[in-house]
Amino acid sequence: NGYKEDFYLADNQPDSAFLDKLPFEHYVVVRPENIKASYVEGRQSIVPELLKELDAAGYNILFLPRYESDRDYAQGIKNIYMPKEAVNGLDACYYADAILTGAGTMAREAACLGVPSVSFFAGAHLLSVDQSLVDAGKMFFSRDVAQIMQYLEHAKDSFFEYRAGGIAGLERCKQVQQEILDVLEQQIRAYLKSQN
């Protein structure tokens, strides 16, 4: 009753010093879609418009460009931080107020942690695992910036609820991991018993 991300998130120990590396305590993460991928035919990135709207609404943005050229999207944006070095993506998810990404893994990680998660995946179809998270209400999907901003406004209340009890997402991941380990142990025991 979980996702592959639950299994490895269960063992993650968030770095309590992560926020010390950022210029702000509250932020949303923006990770561009992979416009250069073969499964994306002729689509334009929504990130330039999304960054402008987030900036206008007063959000602090941790921007994680995929390509060097993605850095151009940040020109003129005031409340944005682009790390010079790679950051721990799991810590970025754990401490974020929301994740907005064109990448599936980060959106799923956030959803599993209980962090408001927005996917603006640019492919023709969502992966079935992402669609199941959307159907369960754990992830929001849209490539329409106005819809994304509206979702964020409605999700704002949960930003602070999550921060107050953020460990709940990790506890759920640990429960999923334990269920998997229990099933594996049962299967191994049954196999070993059949070999005697």
Predicted regions span which residues?
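A nucleotide-sugar donor-handling region in carbohydrate enzymes
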Residues: 1-43
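Active-site regions of enzymes building and remodeling cell-envelope glycoconjugates
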Residues: 1-3, 73-86, 135-139
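Conserved mixed alpha/beta catalytic, RNA-binding, or beta-rich assembly cores of soluble enzyme
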Residues: 6, 11-12, 43-44, 67-68, ...
